[in-house]
């Protein structure tokens, strides 16, 4: 079985390398077969790497550039092409890594990911997904902040992405599609939500 390789933006998040490297060390203990590629400022990370001597299944790639939480996504995309975030996403693009993790600037993460990785045919926008516990197991909720204004088509696409994610990642054979609304009655919500409800009913019946 092929080893999973995950790229990590060491500089992302409010606490920077300290929290990120601690998190990678915890993950490597739980998943010893996963390899990590860390992208960030080596000098600023050395002290935290030394504090986690059990972290051995990783490579570190140095860069002086990082994206701050208040950087505009467009500027991060155009000007910070050697940032730890950009290099990690490039690693997925080149298929050297299977996934990428960053606790950094969400807007920049979405913008760079869409520019570098693109979206698959039939999907117009990326979405942020979260996995929430339920009485019966788990549910995938999206979008959780990547998009402000959505069309009916966008919402349907998000549902389809959630369906595929549930099947592949969570192992749910027949996910149930739902629509988060202001009420359970089909007459509730604006015109976009109502149309989405009708479209999801058609998809669910197929």
Where are these regions (language model features)?
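Phosphate/nucleotide-donor binding subsite
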Residues: 53-97
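Short, acidic/small-residue loops that bind anionic groups at enzyme active sites
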Residues: 110-145, 202-206
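Short beta-strand segments
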Residues: 9, 38-39, 61, 102-104, ...
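N-terminal phosphate-binding or glycine-rich loops at protein starts, especially the Walker A/P-loop
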Residues: 1-45
